């Protein structure tokens, strides 16, 4: 089944009892039992809910996995995955990882004894050097947030397998429409479903899919024990969003290519970060590893003052956290998504005060280009 078809017909669809074409929203907390201690598949909605189950079945198919679970946010999903590990365990992570991931690893999970090392995962040498006897996982974003570096997932899967550790991939930026990490050897794939999967800036959620049922059972135990589950209303919204994911990603990808080409040739832009550019060091890998380049673009215009002037001139782009929506969003990583990372560390990574991140939407590309052009001309 082709991806666009699977997004509509995959998983659990409709309701056999009523003939409803859409999955119902089961706004319920508990379920009648025929006898004490016996249930018919559901007992309490923290453990399972029919609407959430339908979403989980869908995303499991989309990621070609064996088990899937829906969480109350992307960070709840990431934290639950990290709770698979014990005090004294070590995780190797992408260096310019999302600020929330950096924060939970260095400010929360470290207090539980889970150690972390951040390296450039696009470098085989750095990853292999970072692995210790107590390393349990390699955690990757590809493309990374916000510098859009590309990591070779097949290579990382080989390194992880030889080291006897898990490979965890945050697939938020590319989505299963463009990239399927489990088919390339990953053990766990996760999403901030708030972003492209939802796609409309109206739901917060996280999704995790595992390559094995056994790993899925371990994760479900953590989820049920800690309680960070997604509610039925939000589960339904995500299923609705996923139906148009293919259409949206194609439109976003085409818009991003045009905008990146414009920015790459604009004198006000000092550095462009976009894997679709032939000048990007990961361009060839991005072409073979995924079916598209996605809708994220970062570029540096030199200073905080120039950034503020540029943002003040924009008319269509909304200054906001998050990404992956139908509307184009723009942010300043140093002051927004990555503000939790110490300034010295940000500068080491290249996350400067002049760096801007765009999440391209599905508006007409000509309107977006005109808006960016006039905003740059007047700084």
Swiss-Prot record:
Reaction catalysed by this enzyme: L,L-cystathionine + H2O = 2-oxobutanoate + L-cysteine + NH4(+); L-homocysteine + H2O = 2-oxobutanoate + hydrogen sulfide + NH4(+) + H(+)
Organism: Bacillus subtilis (strain 168)
Keywords attached to this entry: Lyase, Pyridoxal phosphate
Knockout or disruption consequences: No visible phenotype.
Pfam families: Cys_Met_Meta_PP
Role this protein plays: Catalyzes the conversion of cystathionine to cysteine, and homocysteine to sulfide.
Induction: By methionine. Repressed by sulfate and cysteine.
Family designation: Belongs to the trans-sulfuration enzymes family.
SUPFAM superfamilies: PLP-dependent transferases
Main EC class the enzyme belongs to: lyase
Gene: mccB
Keyword Lyase: yes
Record's signal peptide: none
Protein name: Cystathionine gamma-lyase
GO molecular function terms noted in the UniProt entry: cystathionine gamma-lyase activity; cystathionine gamma-synthase activity; homocysteine desulfhydrase activity; pyridoxal phosphate binding
One Gene Ontology cellular component annotation held by this UniProt entry: cytoplasm
EC numbers on record: 4.4.1.1, 4.4.1.2
Alphabetical GO biological process terms: cysteine biosynthetic process via cystathionine; homocysteine catabolic process; positive regulation of cell population proliferation; transsulfuration
Cofactor(s) required for function per UniProt: pyridoxal 5'-phosphate
PANTHER family for the chain: CYSTATHIONINE GAMMA-LYASE, TRANS-SULFURATION ENZYME FAMILY MEMBER
Gene3D superfamilies: Aspartate Aminotransferase, domain 1, Type I PLP-dependent aspartate aminotransferase-like (Major domain)
N6-(pyridoxal phosphate)lysine PTM sites in chain numbering: 195
């Amino acid at each position: 089944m082709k991806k666009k078809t699977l997004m509509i017909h995959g998983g659990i669809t409709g309701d056999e009892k009523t003939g409803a074409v859409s999955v119902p929203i089961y706004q319920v907390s508990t379920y009648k039992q025929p006898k004490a201690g016996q249930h018919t598949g559901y007992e309490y909605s923290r453990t399972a809910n029919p609407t959430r189950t339908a979403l989980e079945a869908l995303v499991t198919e989309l990621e070609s996995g064996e088990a899937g679970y829906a969480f109350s946010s992307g960070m709840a999903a990431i934290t639950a995955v990290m709770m698979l590990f014990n005090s004294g365990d070590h995780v190797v992570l992408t260096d310019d990882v999302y600020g929330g991931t950096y924060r939970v690893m260095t400010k929360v999970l470290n207090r539980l004894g889970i150690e972390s090392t951040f390296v450039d995962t696009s470098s085989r040498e750095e990853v292999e050097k970072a692995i210790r006897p107590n390393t349990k996982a390699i955690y990757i974003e590809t493309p990374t947030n916000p510098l859009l570096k590309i990591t070779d997932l097949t290579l990382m899967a080989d390194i992880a397998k030889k080291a006897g550790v898990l490979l965890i991939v945050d697939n938020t930026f590319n989505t299963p429409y463009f990239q399927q990490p489990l088919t390339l050897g990953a053990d766990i794939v996760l999403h901030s479903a708030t972003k492209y999967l939802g796609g409309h800036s109206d739901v917060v959620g996280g999704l995790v899919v595992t390559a094995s049922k056994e790993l899925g059972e371990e994760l479900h135990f953590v989820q049920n024990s800690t309680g960070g589950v997604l509610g039925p209303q939000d589960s339904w919204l995500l299923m609705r969003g996923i139906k148009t994911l293919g259409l949206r990603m194609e439109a976003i990808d085409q818009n991003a290519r045009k905008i990146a080409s414009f920015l790459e040739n604009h004198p006000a832009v000092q550095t462009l970060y976009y894997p679709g550019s032939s000048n990007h060091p990961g361009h060839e890998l991005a072409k073979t590893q995924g079916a598209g380049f996605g809708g994220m673009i970062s570029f540096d215009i030199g200073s905080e003052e120039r950034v503020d002037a540029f943002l003040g001139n924009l008319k269509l782009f909304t200054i906001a956290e998050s990404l992956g929506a139908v509307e184009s969003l723009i942010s300043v990583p140093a002051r927004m998504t990555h503000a939790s990372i110490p300034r010295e560390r940000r500068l080491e990574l290249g996350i400067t005060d002049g760096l801007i991140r765009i999440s391209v939407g599905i508006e007409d590309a000509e309107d977006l280009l005109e808006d960016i052009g006039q905003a740059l001309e007047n700084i």
